[in-house]
Design a protein with these regions (language model features):
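Short acidic DE-rich linear segments
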Residues: 128-131
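Switch/communication elements of ASCE P-loop NTPase nucleotide-binding domains
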Residues: 1-125
Length: 131
C-alpha cells in the first residue's frame, strides 16, 4: 500500500499502525500529538481517540496532545473512563493573560475547555441573532 495515495485522514491511522508494528512506541514512552483529529471526520475522531486511549492503556505511554475539537476531547474523556485509565489523564487549558502565556490544570473543571472551544459558535449565534 502506498501511503501517498491515501487521504490525509487515513494516513493518520496508517502512521499510527506503522509506529505500533515497527516497535517505535515503547512501554512507558511518550507520544506527542498536535491536533491529530484535524483531518478526521467526527466519527473517525472518536475512533482515533479510542485507539490512543487503548495504546496508553496497553503500553503505559505518556500521551501529550493538543486539540481544538470538542468531539475529540469528549471522546478522550469518555474512553479514559471506559478503559479505566481516567486516573492517569490530566487536562490543561492554555490561555494568555497580560501578554503572558499560561497553562492551567483544569482536570477538575474540564468544562473550562469546552467553554473556550464553544466560544466561536456562540459568537456566530450572536451574529445570527442580530440579522
Amino acid at each position: 500500500m502506498n501511503v501517498r495515495n491515501l487521504s490525509t485522514g487515513l494516513k493518520t491511522f496508517v502512521i499510527l499502525k506503522m509506529l505500533l508494528t515497527s516497535g517505535v512506541i515503547e512501554r512507558n514512552g511518550t507520544i506527542i500529538l498536535d491536533e491529530p483529529e484535524i483531518h478526521l471526520h467526527p466519527e473517525w475522531q472518536l475512533l482515533f481517540a479510542e485507539l490512543i486511549v487503548l495504546i496508553q492503556k496497553e503500553f503505559g505511554v505518556h500521551v501529550l496532545l493538543n486539540t481544538h475539537s470538542p468531539y475529540f476531547l469528549n471522546a478522550i474523556e469518555v474512553y479514559t473512563v471506559k478503559y479505566g485509565v481516567d486516573d492517569k489523564c490530566k487536562y490543561y487549558l492554555a490561555f494568555s493573560k497580560d501578554d503572558i502565556s499560561n497553562i492551567e490544570d483544569v482536570t477538575d473543571n474540564i468544562e473550562a475547555i469546552y467553554s473556550k472551544l464553544a466560544r466561536p459558535l456562540q459568537d456566530l449565534e450572536n451574529e445570527r441573532g442580530q440579522l
